[in-house]
Amino acid sequence: MSLLTTIIVTFLAGVGAGLGTGFAGMSAAAVISPMLITFLGIEPYMAVGIALSSDVLASAVSAYTYHKNKNLDIKNGLIMMVSVLAFTVVGSFIARLVPSTTMGNFSVFMTFLLGVKFIVRPVMTTKDDMLHVSAKKRAVQSVVYGIIIGFICGFVGAGGGMMMLLLLTTVLGYELKTAVGTSVFIMTFTALTGAVSHFAIGGAPDWTVCFLCVVFTLIWARIAAVLANKADPKTLNRATGIVLVLLGAAVMGFNLLA
């Protein structure tokens, strides 16, 4: 495996993962893992660890950008994050007891469908609409849906970015930018926990691949987050939808190759 091949694969993986994270709060694991497994022959468990470590800084820089533009609900984000982290552990414990199924494809298919939804039925909720929900109700919803997301993340082994975006926009009635900002904020911590546990269990990764993935994903996530915060809602819905459809289709293609 030449260094040039490694650079090209990690660059393309970083572009896809970064755009997905910055525009839609998508977990980098959905894009990076299949590419590393398919083209660089990296062992699946390690590929997920590298993808999650790429997620940490990309999500953090995206969350910072959304926060700077006042598109982040920190209070409810923190409540949801605690539920997600706690029940991810429960989910992964139960997943060990149940026969393993390849449910990773489920999250990729969901990414594709969510992309179609944003193009066909854009989320046009405004910040004013969000004020109609009481703080208490919002907090309770954050706990309940955090538990559901965490359990599914642990059980399926997915980052949960798409699930969070779907629930925040459709069930909790968040405006799109605030939903993405809150999703990447939560994902910074879930990805960090996941990356640390992967490397603790599976050993150190290929540092060259890991470093390149982290840097490329970070750069493209920053670019996408800046563009997303400047866009008007309709354009953002369309851009987010197109990014998700393309990434979903590409990853399904990689899975077929693998």
Each PLM stretch: what is its role?
Residues 54, 182-198, 208-221:
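A small-residue-rich subset of transmembrane alpha-helices
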